[in-house]
């Protein structure tokens, strides 16, 4: 049985956490696994159910937190000499790698690690678990002949459309949406004309939003006709129930990001954290991820359409996955971050 047991405001940091308890299926609790995660509890339920089916004596305490709050809690609890979560799963790739790089994660060599892609494993301390591309979403009725398929084509389309596209394209607010900032930073590395595209979006009065849902809602009902650099896993899920929403992986290149898992060094029960990681990386766990959570699986043992293997077979070098490595730490450099944000705003304003 699942119970919402608390809505915590954790002082002094004033971090907000929704805390859920998944009772042990056996009815006789022998252990409790503690998870900190950015994944919505509703999405996490099938994964936890699969783990508990194999481990019926284990209850799960699931704390739903923001990416920055997870980093702050693990750091603060470890530095205080106490214990922290047994397992951490976050969409904040850079912050997860920072925890591992700074010594807050323990090396875990689960059996599945031997077959894990090299880019998705950093020193057995941080593992990519999903494979999520950035996509262009579009309002199908507005594009009877199909949407732009490359960034150059998108630039040409916005330039030619002029005032007809004013206020009709959306993207993430890169100051409030970490994924939007990461996608822009990677675009800058792969696409020499990115700032020409940003200038064209600014001329079209691009609308900026902190969440994927706000963009997807507006594109699916036609208030927007395009959404740039949207997280593909959410877009694909939304498109299943909104037939007017289309999506395309731009053909010049497609940035792919991942949600990252680790077992903290100060875990209260590291053995339970390792057991959950092992299940998550197993064929069974990754199949649940792909089929029930609808998040593309990294494991090479999963070959269905919602997997890294299938996407790589179909798209090859078009895909540019972000490696789990200290290279991500550059995106946490505050001076560099501010320079990119300043350039973004100035370019949107046509300066």
Describe these PLM feature segments.
Residues 3-13:
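Bacterial N-terminal signal peptides
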Residues 17-97:
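Early extracytoplasmic/lumenal segment of secretory-pathway proteins
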Residues 34, 38-45, 83-85, 90-223:
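Extracytoplasmic ligand-binding site segments that recognize negatively charged/polar headgroups
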Residues 94-98, 220, 224-244:
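A ligand-binding cleft/hinge motif common to bilobed small-molecule-binding domains
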Residues 118, 131-133, 197-202, 208, ...:
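Periplasmic-binding protein-like
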Residues 137-142, 183-185, 257-272, 288:
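A bilobed periplasmic-binding-protein/Venus flytrap-type ligand-binding module shared by bacterial periplasmic
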Residues 264-324:
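Mature extracytoplasmic/periplasmic domains
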Residues 322-351:
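Conserved C-terminal helix/tail region of periplasmic/extracytoplasmic solute-binding proteins
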């Amino acid at each position: 049985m699942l119970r919402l047991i608390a809505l915590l405001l954790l002082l002094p940091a004033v971090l907000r956490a929704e805390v859920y308890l998944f009772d042990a299926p056996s009815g006789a609790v022998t252990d409790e696994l503690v998870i900190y995660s950015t994944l919505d509890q509703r999405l996490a339920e099938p994964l936890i159910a699969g783990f508990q089916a194999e481990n019926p004596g284990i209850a799960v305490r699931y704390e739903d937190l923001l990416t920055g709050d997870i980093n702050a809690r693990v750091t603060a609890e470890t530095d205080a000499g106490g214990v922290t979560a047994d397992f951490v799963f976050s969409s904040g790739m850079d912050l997860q790698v920072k925890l591992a790089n700074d010594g807050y994660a323990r090396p875990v060599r689960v059996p599945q690690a031997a077959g894990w892609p090299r880019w998705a494993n950093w020193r057995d301390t941080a593992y990519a678990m999903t494979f999520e591309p950035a996509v262009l979403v579009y309002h199908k009725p507005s594009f009877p002949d199909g949407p732009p398929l490359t960034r150059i084509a998108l630039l040409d389309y916005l330039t030619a459309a002029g005032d007809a596209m004013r206020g009709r394209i959306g993207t993430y607010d890169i100051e409030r949406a970490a994924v939007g900032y990461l996608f822009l930073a990677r675009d800058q590395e792969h696409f020499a004309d990115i700032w020409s595209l940003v200038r064209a979006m600014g001329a079209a009065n691009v609308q900026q939003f902190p969440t994927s849902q706000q963009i997807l809602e507006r594109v699916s009902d036609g208030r927007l006709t395009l959404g740039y650099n949207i997280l593909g896993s959410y877009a694909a899920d939304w498109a299943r129930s909104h037939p007017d929403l289309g999506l395309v992986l731009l053909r010049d290149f497609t940035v792919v990001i991942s949600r990252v898992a680790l077992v903290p060094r100060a875990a209260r029960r590291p053995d339970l954290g390792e057991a959950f990681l092992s299940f998550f990386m197993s064929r069974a766990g990754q199949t649940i991820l792909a089929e029930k959570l609808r998040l593309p699986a990294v494991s090479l043992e999963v070959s269905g359409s919602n997997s890294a293997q299938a996407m790589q077979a179909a798209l090859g070098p078009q895909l540019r996955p972000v490696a789990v490595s200290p290279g991500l730490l550059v995106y946490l450099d505050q001076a560099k971050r501010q320079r990119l944000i300043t350039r973004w705003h100035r370019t949107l304003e046509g300066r």
